[in-house]
Amino acid sequence: MEQHTPRHRPSGQYAAADTRRAAIIDSALALFAKAGYLNSSLAKIAAEAGTSATVITHHFGSKQRLLMAVLEARDERTMRTFGELGPDSGGDDVRALFREVLALAAYNLTQPGLIQLYTKLSAEAGDPAHPAHAYFAERYERVAHSLASALQRSFDAGQLRPGTDPESIAREILAVSDGLQVQWAIAEGRLDFVGLYRAHLDRLTQALTVDGQGLDEPAGAERLP
């Protein structure tokens, strides 16, 4: 009986496909950030990427799946740089935690398209029918839980004042961060996001810690050059 050797796609074809997918994701990110998801058609994304809507459908299946690929790419970039704050991230120093949060905010400013994407989509996703609604709902819960868990370690270590509610503080930090991101985007980058965020975290550290001291780093240390 004749045996057939399975045909495998050459590695060069895989690389070309990956490159094409990455280019489509970058183009979709730029268009979603500028016009929002609802006002971005596959035809417009294809024109931005220099390809066709058929090619995009071949790689992603639908605009909704492309959106999720864009959001996942955003998270992967952040994870590669900072990892995940959470119960297993180690450490109980609240100042180290806040400095890491501040460094993440500064890193995000190096990718203004991602901030514009996030602020635009998070506003749209308030509608339960929006395809990114579940993503943002899950993400807020996950990030709030991670921050609250890290703050709980600081509380258990005796760094924070009695009566501190880690969950409430985590939600406050997220609210301030998101609010400043919106203002930064509207001001087209002219707002001193990092300086304002650092000032808030410094006041928060003084209010929460038993020793009443602020962040250890000198003012402006985390500012972008």
Locate the predicted segments by residue:
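N-terminal intrinsically disordered/low-complexity leader segments
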Residues: 1-19, 212-225
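Hydrophobic alpha-helical connector segments
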Residues: 69, 82-115, 166-173, 220, ...
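Amphipathic alpha-helical packing segments from all-alpha helical-bundle domains
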Residues: 79, 83-84, 96, 112-113, ...
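Hydrophobic/aromatic-rich alpha-helical bundle segments in the mid-to-C-terminal region
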Residues: 116, 129-141, 156-204, 208-225
